[in-house]
């Protein structure tokens, strides 16, 4: 009995001991600790592993059971050996149990003879300067270890405990969960600068007294490893006794140590040790020294291997101890989402290591640290690392002598890297690197190709990723804000990007950077984009990519990314707006059809300081019919006035090309009108050079894309991709598309076969307006597996040489990432990785390209590959010859069919001749417009050999057309349209056709020009009913193009009335034109088809006062967002449609009103002749004067009574919903029985501050539809006043300016002048908008621009602010007619300083202080307010994020600490204020004579603009400027001080009545010129009239914010020239006036 009780007691104790344990227990052979086995993903990431789906061994963590048998503490909070049972004189393993909260006795330290291993399941705190000497620490789940200024010293494990940890976690720290904090009380890491060879000045400290008696350890440019010296000091000057630092070393870090005692907290070791963090441990390390930590060397990994019993999976029979365990580093952190390492020093072990820092699936913030050691990498980020933010760290590396012999087993990171990453989410800003061969090495390997952790998830880590072998990566950007290093020594490579072939179709982008080192990429299956890159010094791009895009970049001599064998290899290349040095540029010849390669080659090395190529046309391969005309254009930007003597010369390899201008002197544009006479192709080259100078002074050579000249093509064959065995036909405009291709690669009997790796999809979204077209695009095919080629084989005629192929795709996005589309013909690429983007809505994609059948093929193979979410719906083939359609048919007797058909055709032709003859006279003066519907494309009815009127060439509308003509036709598809093509910058954009005759660009980049006539009367595209989001929104346009501005009359253009459905089409025509808008609705389809062609007679339309009924035929928001392109529609809109709402209180109505009331008798609802009584006829929703809350649903009821003896049918058209309101009702139609009251309910919800005045249109008709009446029911509701504004209530008055992020208009809101800023969607970050608005709402200061409210209209965000009519400060600095006195200048500066002082007191930095963002309200120094600070789009609250590192603002106004990659502080605004003062007084833009790239260098060298002694003779003014732009931020004054100082300065000038205006200095008395006064006055009157006109223009162009005044600076030269002429005319008059005065 006693034996049984004893056993039970042992089991209970054992179970209690193991309450902390997780995982299963594993038994090991004698001499080893038993192990616990944990599946890390299941226990730490909560990601379930499906049985037998993956090999779980790589996911398993084995840790020793040391804590099971450890001695546990008594119930005491004081940590001492007495509180643990057992001998205090032997090394012991002890454990602080769960719930215990122990603190080390302040008078004690832990001696190695007492403790071997300390296990913490409760809480343990060690205080200041206490030393813990022990073998290791194990933090169990839930445990907490706090080391506050304590010292940890690791020693070898006890020799008396003979058991071995097979996985070598100890000595060191092993954390399985809970939290660890290692925090020092004193800052230990400092920066310094050399004064003499052995003297340093230590930054940010006034005295070195706290470190008296210490040694100093130093890392610098010359010493990448730690060097230690004794020192003496005087205040913060440090003189080293054992070390000499060269004065040329600019990056010096130092820390202090007390001969190894680590007085201020740290870890040292007498043996090899490591820190292993897992289990979502919360880790915080700050002001702490980790010295000589780490076990893993840079040799090949050698992990411990376990052999398990075949009978028992929990029994290990043999163990082979690894000699180089991976991840036993200074710090290895995995599965931890809260890690902070700040202002600490991490020194690797004394030998070589793989890396000091290794992270795996963790979120880490590491900043302000020194990481130094002999290692393969300074930091390694593995799979699953969700987020690493590294900033202001100093990574110093000594390359090891040992490297692994094989890259297998995930043996990466040994190459000498700064940061090596297998994760894309690395943010490295302002980090300093010293000694590395490679700064950033990114290796994106699909997991199935990596042994070891081959099934580990990586970002984004989702539930299913563990069982998915390889996920496609999202597009990855390397930009200046994310990867922004400071490299001390030259490196071999700035960036290496590698991806194996399994990771396909991913775009990698390097952008917004100046790069002086090499980049190597291995992206065989992916694309690389270089955007806004400046390559200097040793920049070189090498490697291999599938597609290379280069945009807006400049490459200096010997830095060109040459293409081909000597540089980077790519199958497809896109080069636009980028310059290359002639001798270094090499271009491969095998370019695919979709490539657009237009480099600007230059020979003059500093050409970018004199002249730049702004744009060219055409920018991609161009197709044009024989006899067509084209303007070849090169637009230039002249930087230096020396380059006024330039000429452009055109060269051609085709003698049949004629041009009216072969060599032409130019100012800002070269233009060559060309005519093409014969079939074939031509290559053109334009040379821009200095006039009358030899070839050595060539500025640019531009080789234009190939131009193809062709005759018309005819329709040959078409196929619809249906899963159909029937030989059905879809007829579109007389062209037959056969249904279905057979799935068989060996079926030669069919004219179309498809590879068998496809899947079908049916019922794709209806995207058009014709049943035939809907049927053509209703079904589609794609590959079963992602990125797998689908091949279609179809017949062609072997004798025909030229074909065009047109493919119709529908893209249905599965996420917000673009889908790359690749197309091949006969295994040759046509398009590679064309990105299809559509946010969340499906899009229609039409791609057209040429095929030259030079091998006389009878069959052609067309292949495509996508992610699996883009479907080929149909295809068409066009032939250059008239050939019979290749579909076999049975031979039948056609005579009985042909004879009656011929008779019928003759009769119809006679009728048509009579009909069109009668119409000829009526239209003979009109410009004829002809359109046929094939998708949304235009085609020519020019006589050809086409057997049916189909596209002579299939065309795609494109938005980037640079042809222009004063007499042109333009059809523009709005930016919100879902018709998508590839634009000139290779982004998918809405499309535009704009022609001199007609010019069109295909999605392939091929541009077709042909003489196209468009006939609106033949176009009828019927609306469809679709509850899903349609592809094309309704749009109409009433456009007045007459010279006298008179509006069009509907009666005059009745035959031009059409219903157009297809994406906000803007139509400009010389002739008359009238189009109505009908949006989708829930009415009966047949009803609107019946009513659509009806236009109400004038006597049937209700009489409406001006503003009472205003249709909105123009898409307002898109015209406002593109004021340059839509100049004429914008002018028309501002003139005619000031706003939708018209006058306050007037009623609006639905745009389909005319449809519903057509052919009815309109009567007021109180009219006794109306056969139905309506009550109430004004609905106020029971408010009784109360105002509605936003979001409140307001209900009302309308009752109808039929006064007739027969039933009536009532149809209702409710107001259209928008961003400000929604009107809804369950009733759209009801039957009204005789003499019976019938009621309907409706509700209105308001979402903005608005006065809601709308109408419900009601149509009554008899059941036989022989009689019909219509009336209005009025809706009236008003919301509470909030800061959410209804855009419909804003009256837009005029365009002011456009900046990077938005467009600004002057407007009126509820009788108050306001500035309306529309934010461009491509720059909209909704979180940033909310932050800015939250900031604006809280700012209330007389010198800060007043925030009025916000709005959303048609998906566009807008901000409304106070309007300052006098414009921005820049105008008063740089325009002569606005010169201001010194008193006015000082008064303006006072207001600016007061505003900024207010911002800084509230923890806000402006970050973009410059004259363009200062608005002038008054020039009277006595006014309460003279200036206001605006544009808070770049402001940040410093108390929200302590480290403001987003690089924004104007470079000339950026302080040295920003440009040297430092952080934003309030003092950066002071620096900008100093530059503003300089510009204000000197009337010169800072660094105006320097190129953009030089400014940063000058600022960092502390070279400021020179102060003209004549201008800055007042030392008070010059003192403000020089103190504000001081290199040392701590020496800059505050805005509170500046405000007081400027007020004192204003009194000084005001008292002395000094007018400091250089324009008035030269006025002299001249009494001899009185006789010339009158003549000069006459001339001056004329000049004044011109000036007044200019004043009016300037008043309309006052700039508000967001670069609103940039145009002022750009136009200064022109203004100065005009003013100089004026001043010359007025010179005598001025002298005379002065004399008279």
UniProtKB/Swiss-Prot annotation:
Gene Ontology biological process terms in this record: negative regulation of developmental process; regulation of developmental process
Membrane-traversing stretches: 897-917
Cytoplasmic compartment segments: 918-1637
Compartments, record wording: Membrane
Stretches for region Disordered: 977-1000, 1557-1637
Enzyme class: transferase
Keyword field contains rRNA processing: no
Lipid bilayer topology: Single-pass type I membrane protein
Deleted gene: phenotype: Cells initiate multicellular development prematurely.
Biased composition (Polar residues): 977-990
Biological role stated in the UniProt entry: Regulates the transition between growth and differentiation.
Protein name (Swiss-Prot/TrEMBL): Probable serine/threonine-protein kinase gdt2
């Amino acid at each position: 009995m006693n034996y049984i009780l004893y056993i039970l007691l042992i089991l209970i104790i054992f179970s209690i001991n193991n309450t902390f344990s997780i995982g299963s227990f594993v038994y090991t052979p004698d001499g080893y600790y038993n192990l616990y086995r944990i599946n890390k993903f299941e226990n730490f990431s909560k990601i379930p592993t499906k049985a037998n789906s993956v090999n779980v061994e790589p996911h398993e963590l084995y840790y020793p059971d040391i804590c099971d048998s450890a001695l546990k503490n008594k119930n005491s909070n004081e940590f001492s050996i007495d509180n643990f049972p057992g001998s205090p004189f032997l090394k012991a393993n002890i454990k602080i149990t769960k719930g215990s909260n122990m603190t080390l006795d302040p008078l004690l330290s832990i001696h190695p003879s007492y403790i071997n291993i300390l296990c913490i399941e409760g809480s343990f705190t060690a205080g200041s300067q206490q030393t813990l000497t022990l073998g290791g620490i194990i933090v169990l789940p839930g445990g907490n270890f706090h080391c506050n200024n304590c010292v940890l010293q690791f020693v070898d494990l006890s020799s008396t405990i003979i058991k071995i940890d097979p996985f070598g976690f100890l000595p060191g720290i092993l954390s399985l969960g809970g939290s660890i904090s290692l925090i020092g009380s004193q800052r230990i890491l400092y920066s310094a600068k050399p004064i003499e060879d052995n003297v340093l000045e230590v930054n940010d400290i006034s005295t070195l007294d706290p470190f008296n008696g210490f040694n100093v350890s130093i890392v610098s440019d010359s010493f990448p490893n730690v060097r230690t010296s004794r020192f003496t000091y005087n205040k913060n000057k440090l003189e080293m006794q054992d070390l000499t630092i060269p004065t040329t070393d600019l990056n010096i870090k130092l820390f202090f140590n007390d001969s190894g005692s680590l007085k201020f907290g740290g870890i040292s070791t007498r043996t090899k040790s490591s820190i292993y963090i897992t289990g979502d441990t919360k880790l915080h390390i700050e002001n702490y020294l980790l010295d000589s930590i780490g076990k893993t060397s840079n040799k090949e990994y050698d992990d411990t291997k376990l052999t398990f019993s075949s009978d028992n999976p929990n029994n290990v029979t043999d163990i082979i101890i690894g000699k180089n365990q991976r991840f036993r580093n200074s710090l290895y952190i995995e599965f931890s989402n809260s890690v902070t390492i700040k202002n600490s020093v991490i020194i690797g072990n004394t030998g070589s290591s793989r890396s000091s820092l290794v992270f795996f699936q963790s979120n880490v913030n590491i900043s302000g640290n020194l990481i130094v050691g002999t290692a393969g990498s300074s930091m390694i980020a593995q799979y699953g690392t969700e987020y690493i933010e590294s900033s202001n760290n100093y990574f110093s590396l000594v390359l090891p002598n040992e490297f692994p012999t094989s890259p297998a087993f995930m043996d990466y990171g040994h190459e000498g890297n700064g940061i090596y990453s297998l994760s894309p989410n690395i943010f490295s800003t302002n980090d300093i690197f010293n000694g590395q061969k490679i700064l950033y090495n990114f290796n994106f390997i699909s997991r199935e190709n990596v042994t070891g952790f081959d099934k580990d998830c990586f970002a984004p880590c989702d539930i299913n990723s563990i069982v998915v072998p390889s996920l496609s990566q999202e597009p990855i950007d390397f930009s200046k804000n994310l990867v922004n290093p400071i490299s001390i020594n030259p490196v071999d490579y700035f960036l290496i990007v590698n991806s194996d072939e399994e990771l396909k179709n991913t775009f990698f982008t390097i952008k917004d950077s100046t790069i002086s080192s090499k980049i190597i990429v291995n992206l065989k299956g992916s694309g690389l984009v270089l955007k806004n890159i400046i390559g200097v010094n040793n920049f070189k791009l090498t490697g291999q990519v599938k597609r290379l895009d280069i945009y807006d970049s400049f490459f200096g001599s010997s830095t060109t990314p040459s293409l081909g064998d000597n540089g980077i290899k790519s199958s497809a290349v896109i080069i636009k707006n980028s310059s290359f040095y002639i001798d270094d540029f090499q271009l491969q010849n095998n370019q695919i059809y979709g490539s657009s390669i237009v480099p600007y080659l230059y020979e003059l090395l500093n050409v970018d300081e004199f002249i730049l190529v702004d744009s060219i046309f055409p920018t991609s391969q161009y197709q044009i019919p024989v006899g067509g005309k084209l303007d070849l254009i090169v637009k230039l930007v002249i930087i230096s006035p020396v380059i006024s003597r330039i000429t452009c010369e055109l060269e051609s390899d085709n003698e049949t090309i004629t041009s009216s201008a072969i060599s032409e002197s130019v100012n800002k544009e070269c233009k060559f009108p060309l005519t093409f006479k014969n079939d074939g192709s031509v290559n053109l080259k334009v040379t821009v050079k200095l006039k009358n100078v030899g070839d050595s002074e060539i500025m640019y050579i531009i080789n234009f894309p190939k131009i193809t000249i062709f005759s018309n093509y005819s329709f040959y064959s078409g196929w619809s991709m249906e899963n159909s065995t029937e030989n059905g036909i879809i007829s579109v405009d007389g062209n037959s598309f056969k249904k279905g291709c057979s799935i068989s690669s060996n079926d030669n009997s069919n004219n179309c076969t498809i590879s068998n790796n496809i899947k079908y999809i049916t019922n794709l979204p209806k995207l058009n307006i014709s049943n035939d077209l809907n049927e053509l695009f209703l079904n589609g095919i794609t590959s079963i597996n992602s990125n797998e080629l689908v091949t279609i084989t179809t017949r062609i005629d072997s004798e025909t040489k030229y074909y065009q192929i047109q493919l119709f795709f529908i893209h249905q996005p599965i996420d917000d990432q673009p889908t790359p589309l690749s197309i091949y013909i006969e295994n040759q690429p046509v398009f590679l990785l064309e990105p299809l983007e559509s946010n969340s809505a499906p899009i229609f994609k039409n791609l057209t390209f040429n095929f030259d059948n030079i091998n006389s093929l009878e069959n052609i193979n067309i292949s495509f590959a996508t992610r699996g979410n883009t479907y080929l719906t149909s295809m068409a083939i066009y032939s250059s010859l008239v050939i019979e359609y290749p579909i076999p048919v049975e031979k039948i007797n056609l005579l009985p069919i042909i004879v009656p058909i011929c008779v019928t055709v003759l009769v119809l032709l006679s009728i048509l001749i009579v009909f069109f003859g009668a119409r000829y006279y009526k239209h003979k003066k009109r410009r004829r417009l002809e359109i046929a519907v094939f998708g949304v494309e235009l085609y020519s009815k020019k006589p050809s050999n086409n057997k049916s009127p189909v596209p002579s060439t299939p065309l795609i509308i494109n938005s980037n057309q640079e042809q222009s003509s004063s007499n042109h036709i333009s059809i523009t598809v709005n930016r919100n349209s879902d018709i998508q093509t590839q634009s000139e910058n290779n982004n998918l954009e809405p499309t535009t056709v704009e022609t001199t005759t007609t010019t069109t660009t295909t999605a392939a980049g091929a541009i077709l020009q042909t003489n196209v006539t468009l006939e609106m009367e033949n176009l009828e595209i019927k609306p469809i009913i679709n509850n899903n989001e349609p592809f094309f929104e309704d749009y109409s346009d009433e456009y007045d193009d007459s010279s006298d501005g008179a509006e069009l009359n509907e009666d005059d253009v009745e035959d031009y009335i059409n219903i157009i459905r297809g994406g906000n089409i803007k139509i400009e025509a010389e002739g008359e034109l009238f189009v109505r808008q009908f949006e989708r609705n829930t009415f009966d389809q047949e009803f609107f088809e019946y009513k659509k062609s009806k236009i109400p007679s004038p006597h049937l339309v209700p009489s409406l006062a001006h503003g009472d009924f205003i249709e909105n035929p123009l898409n307002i928001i898109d015209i406002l967002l593109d004021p340059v392109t839509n100049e004429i529609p914008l002018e028309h809109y501002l003139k005619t449609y000031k706003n939708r709402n018209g006058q306050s209180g007037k009623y609006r109505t639905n745009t389909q009103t005319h449809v519903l009331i057509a052919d009815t008798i309109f009567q007021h609802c109180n009219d006794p002749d109306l056969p139905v009584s309506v009550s109430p006829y004004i609905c106020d929703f029971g408010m009784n004067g109360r105002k509605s809350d936003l979001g409140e649903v307001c209900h009302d009821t309308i009752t109808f009574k039929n006064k007739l003896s027969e039933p009536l049918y009532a149809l209702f058209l409710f107001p259209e919903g928008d961003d400000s309101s929604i009107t809804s009702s369950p009733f759209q139609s009801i039957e009204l029985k005789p003499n019976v009251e019938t009621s309907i309910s409706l509700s209105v919800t308001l979402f903005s501050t608005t006065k809601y005045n709308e109408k419900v249109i009601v149509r009554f008709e008899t059941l036989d539809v022989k009689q019909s009446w219509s009336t209005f029911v009025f809706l009236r509701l008003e919301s509470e006043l909030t800061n959410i504004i209804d855009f419909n209530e804003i009256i837009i008055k005029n365009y002011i300016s456009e900046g990077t992020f938005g467009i600004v208009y002057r407007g009126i809101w509820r009788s108050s002048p306001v500035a309306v800023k529309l934010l461009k969607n491509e720059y909209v970050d909704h979180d940033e908008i909310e932050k800015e608005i939250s900031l604006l709402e809280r700012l209330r200061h007389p010198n800060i621009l007043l925030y009025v409210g916000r709005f959303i209209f048609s998906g566009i965000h807008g901000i409304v602010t106070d309007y300052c009519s006098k414009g921005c400060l820049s105008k008063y600095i740089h325009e002569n007619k606005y010169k201001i006195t010194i008193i006015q200048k000082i008064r303006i500066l006072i207001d600016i300083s007061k505003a900024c002082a207010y911002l800084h007191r509230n923890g806000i930095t402006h970050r973009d202080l410059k004259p363009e963002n200062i608005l002038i309200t008054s020039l009277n120094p006595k006014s309460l307010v003279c200036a206001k600070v605006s544009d808070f789009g770049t402001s940040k609250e410093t108390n929200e994020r302590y480290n403001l590192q987003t690089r924004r603002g104007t470079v000339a106004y950026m302080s040295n600490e920003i440009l040297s990659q430092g952080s934003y502080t309030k003092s950066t605004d002071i620096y900008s204020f100093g530059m503003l003062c300089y510009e204000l007084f000197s009337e010169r833009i800072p660094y105006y004579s320097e190129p953009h790239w030089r400014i940063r260098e000058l600022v960092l060298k502390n070279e400021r603009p020179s102060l003209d002694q004549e201008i800055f003779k007042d030392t008070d003014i010059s003192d403000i400027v020089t103190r504000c732009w001081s290199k040392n931020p701590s020496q800059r004054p505050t805005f509170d001080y500046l405000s007081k100082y400027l007020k004192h300065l204003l009194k000084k000038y005001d008292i002395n009545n000094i007018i400091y205006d250089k324009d008035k200095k030269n006025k002299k008395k001249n009494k001899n010129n009185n006789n010339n006064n009158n003549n000069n006055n006459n001339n001056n009157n004329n000049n004044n009239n011109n000036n007044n006109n200019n004043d009016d223009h300037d008043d309309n162009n006052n700039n508000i914010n967001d670069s609103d005044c940039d145009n002022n600076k750009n136009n200064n030269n022109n203004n100065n020239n005009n003013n100089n002429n004026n001043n010359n005319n007025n010179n005598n008059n001025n002298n005379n006036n002065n004399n008279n005065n």
